[in-house]
């Protein structure tokens, strides 16, 4: 079935998914005209985001932010980057490019909704990794590495399964409510705050 194929592919690619610590997160700003960007990078640099109403990025405005040292994983140091974009207009299609690890990343798309009337999705407690100690339908014991980042497969099964279900829930919710402006997750987002693999699954 399509679902079993999706699950098989998720398991096969989980090592790659869970070690991708550089996803970009977008969150609402202080008001409707602002948008916050946050991401990890491996390079000490000034974080930048370029934004334009043109897909080819003509006339783009560049915003800079702040960077701090975040975590070290497998001897690799990661930096936390935060940038706020301002001056956004309602009901407008934008294109943006994040500057990460010394290069501009692929251009992405973002559309603002009406400022005075909008809807959003509210979810709670994805808590990636919380299924630890349970036994899966495939008779696997769900283990969790706690506040430790490890590549050992048997220590990441809880995060793997929870992330898969979380992604499915989000995709289905957004398919059913494609007009929402944003999503609010009340938390807990992950089971262990220092386990970056759980965050990778949450953001993936």
Where are these regions (language model features)?
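Divalent metal-dependent phosphoesterase catalytic cores across multiple superfamilies
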Residues: 4-204
